[in-house]
């Protein structure tokens, strides 16, 4: 199987895929050379092909050549989004699949808004303007608008949007640290501030 991690960042999903099945033909694309450098170090001797490119311009990948395109929490940040979906459609095989993980609405899970607000309050103490502007196309954040975008880009495909809620158990500090990892905002905090959060 030919699998593409779209906006692969530092490569954690590619590493999981490689460790799980060494027979996959894996590619990762990201626009950030620094992230790709981290991915290269993480994936030493794996044979994973890493490509520097924007998601709106996947010319390094042939038409109808990818069986599965995965996009883990990056589609939300992309704008314009229509060319991204057009490129995904172009590179997918006729039976190919596209799966993207995106943020859901604030009311999608108990305590999600409270965790979000707590993290952002700490970040905004240091950077008052942080979070005032949402990156990416806002249509990605709504189920109906996302469904409409996907149906337009993939008119022949079965489009399904599922709400999945992550559930965690364990010591409070451990759960808090893991939950903070789901928010980009938590990574802009200095280590001491993040620890106090």
Please describe what each predicted stretch is.
Residues 83-87:
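Short, conserved SAM-binding segment of the class I
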Residues 68-81:
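A short SAM/SAH-binding and catalytic strip from SAM-dependent methyltransferases
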Residues 1, 65, 95-96:
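Surface-exposed loop/turn positions
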Residues 56-68:
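A short acidic, Gly/Pro-enriched loop at the edge of an enzyme's catalytic core
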Residues 2-58:
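Class I SAM-dependent methyltransferase SAM/SAH-binding core
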Residues 158-197:
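C-terminal helical/coil "lid" or tail adjacent to the Rossmann-like core of SAM-dependent
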Residues 78-79, 92-94:
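Helix-to-beta-strand junctions that scaffold the AdoMet/dcAdoMet cofactor pocket
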Residues 82, 97-169:
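Conserved catalytic/acceptor-binding region of the Class I
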